[in-house]
């Protein structure tokens, strides 16, 4: 009888854990990467969800920065340096390299329902 009760208790705990894991809002935020190389950002445009983190990685042999006027600004990134930013507000974020302004990119941040607000 004790064994049967232990099995029932284990089954109930596993079922409860499965149900809680399936609830909305338990999804984990994503991490995405943008590579910097040959004076370009790649990919140049990405779409993420609110709460996602984007990490820029400088694979070039010269320094670069990531600047979104009024939103975020990295220090000068040497080769293999990284800069991460977590997006908490939906919208479109245009950015560029402060040292080489012709290098440009954009991040579209959508809400969980898939819409992007205007920044």
Q: Where on the chain are the PLM-derived regions?
A:
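Extracytoplasmic copper-binding redox domains, predominantly the cupredoxin/blue-copper superfamily
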Residues: 2-10, 18-119
């Amino acid at each position: 009888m004790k064994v049967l009760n232990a099995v029932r208790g284990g089954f109930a705990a596993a079922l409860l854990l499965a149900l809680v894991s399936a609830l909305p809002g338990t999804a984990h935020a994503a991490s995405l990467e943008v590579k910097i190389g040959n004076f370009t950002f790649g990919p140049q445009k990405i779409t993420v969800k609110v709460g996602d983190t984007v990490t820029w990685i400088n694979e070039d042999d010269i320094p670069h920065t990531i600047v979104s006027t009024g939103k975020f600004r990295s220090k000068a990134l040497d080769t293999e340096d990284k800069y991460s930013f977590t997006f908490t507000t939906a919208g479109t974020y245009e950015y560029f390299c402060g040292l080489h302004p012709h290098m440009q990119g954009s991040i579209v941040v959508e809400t969980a329902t898939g819409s992007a607000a205007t920044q």
